[in-house]
Amino acid sequence: MKHGFIKVAAAAPEIRVADPMFNADAVIRAMDEHARLGVKVLVFPELTLTGATCGDLFYQNTLLAGAAAALEKVVKASEGKDMLVFVGLPVAQGAKVYDAAAAVCNGELLGVVPASCPGDKHFALPGALLDDIQIGSLGPVDFHPQQLFQHSEVSELNVAVLVGADVSASVSPAVRHALAGATVLVEMAGFPMATDSACRMTTAVRAESAKLHAGVVLAAPGFGESSTDATYSGLCLIAEDGKVLESAEDGCSDVVTELDVQLLIAARRKDATFTGDAASYVVTEWGEGVEETVLTRPFGKYPYRPDDPADYHAAAKRLLHMQAASLVRRMQYANLKHPVVGISGGVDSTLAVIICAEAVKMMGLPADYVNAVTMPCFGTTDRTKSNAIIVSEQLGATVRVIDIGESVMQHFKDIGHDPENRNVVYENAQARERTQILMDVANGFADGGIHVGTEDMSEFADGWCTYNGDHISMYDVNAGSTKTMVQMVVRYVAETTDDQVLAKALLDVLDTPVSPELLPPTRNGEIAQKSEDSVGPYNLQDFFLYYLVDHGFAPEKVLRLADTAYGDEFDHATLKKWLRSYCRRLFSQQFKRSCLQDGPTLNGFSFSPRTGFLMPSDGSDALYLASVDALK
């Protein structure tokens, strides 16, 4: 459970209808198996100990007493297991029978939760408040539909349960539970199999977990339930904040994975609509200490891309449209006709010129209204210059080549800088000269021009840009896109265009090292200044951006996730080195982010100084660097 990872499971063992002791044995076997796996929350279907299809037998004292005895057996078998188990059974209270879930942990019955919305005529509504309940020799314990089971050591782990028809109720108790603080919603379902049941429930669980920023663990009845009028599939699902992590439907299903409750809390903190309280809830503690959870779930290397590469094209198409549409809106508002973009042959400027081409197309303007300006200087290579021109020409843009070498040398002379001194002045003078040219070219159009920026969010995060140089534009279409997102969109265009000349150039752009090209090339004419040698691989940078900045995880947890995702590429020491570098640059380069121009937010996170991630320009990095340095 360290770092907020909780191993959870949903199980639908084969049962016998109206045979509580047989079913208790099935539950106990599953408990033993999952305890060995380190599971901390185990969920069974509705009415596990009797079966959900007993009909009027639910009124029979014999079945009710048998279910109580079976629960006693399960509770006793849970001794020594630090695992919260939810098992279903019918319970009698006075003249009423209730569809209920028993919460069991380490030899104790912690509470009994009746269904808030019983969907079977045999079961009663629980009312607002019920007395404590005694089940056989167990209890008395709380008997209330509004209960939270809070871990004694992991404050973010609060579990609430939905029983039977609660799972699909039009006004679901899940909302109330989540607003009261439940981060894990246990759903003990009882629905039969239908042609669309798996699809329907998967969609519902995904949506519910996303809306409530919750983990959902669902188990539905499987083999052994009566087939008199229906078939039961044993559907089991585990979802987290809109993503289905595990699912199975094979009659006797069983799924296990880890939920990240820290991720859920991070999402809720940023959701201003997420307000509520637990005043009406009974809160019961469970659990003993914090253990290291062995991670079995995969963590992708590209968190800003879809999990499934098969979805890349659809995501890239949507991103491209969003970026182009945002530029169209700005140009229409300001009555501008000519987007002006500086092209370098790098991936960011390549995407920017593609976006500009798409924007003028959407506006019904000629393709040559796009002005692509390449400004070679001391570090420009033939490869990047050639690719920049080919891409722009194939898109139909007007290409201008303006060599800035002479201008920069004159500038050096004016300020008394020795051009042999290749320090930050040598580099930044080139970037600022380019920005001045692009601004002035845009201003030169009688019917309006706009300097379109190319800098992406990854470079704003690490500050790998020249202040008041490539850092500034009139509108930055890449401001909300990370480097790995930019690469995905450029690859999408390369793989879907019918223009093979364009495709070849785009693929070569993707294969070109990321570089500002501000230092002279090698003797062989190759790029000498490679960004990733200075600031680290952009795949890693985007990974750190997602978990450290976007989700607010501690460096220790971020490094653990990086080891999990990138252990096949980088050793632990290398990952730690680049994480430390990232933390340092995140703070030291904030002054550049504090004055960013407008640009679209594309994935819910940005560095906009108006609506995005905000921090002071002079904040201390000491705490973060000390946290990284303390890691082994």
Predicted regions: what they are:
Residues 6, 155, 213-214, 226, ...:
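ATP/NTP-dependent adenylation/nucleotidyl-transfer catalytic domains that generate, transfer
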Residues 1-340, 358-367, 399:
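Enzyme catalytic cores with a strong preference for nitrogen-chemistry domains
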